[in-house]
C-alpha cells in the first residue's frame, strides 16, 4: 500500500470449511518490542492508552522518535481486540476475526492493514488511513 506519508501492507485472510456447520474463529497476534508508547482508538473515536481500551478499532504504537506503527482490522471483519501485554517497552495484542458459524462451501474473508508512518504526520494521517480503509470494498479475488 502506498501513501505520500506512510508505507503499508494489507493482509487478506480467507476461510472456507468442508464441514456442514462449523465455527472456527481466526485470531491474529502482534507483538512489538522496544516501543515508546501505545494508544488504541475507542469506538467513540478517541485515542486512549492501549491498556485501558477494551475493544479497540485500531492500535497505534510509537516505535521511535520518528516512526509509528498503525494496525487496523476492517470494521466489518473485527470481532474483538484484546491487549494481552503492555509495558513501557513492549506490547502484544490479539484480534479475533471471522468468529462466525460457517456452512460448507462458504468463503469468508477478513482484511487487516499495517502502516508505518512518520510521527510528524500527526493523528490526521491515522484518521485518513482508518477512514479510507473503513470505506473501502473488499477485492473480488478467490
What are these regions (language model features)?
Residues 2-51:
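Acidic (Asp/Glu-rich), glycine- and aromatic
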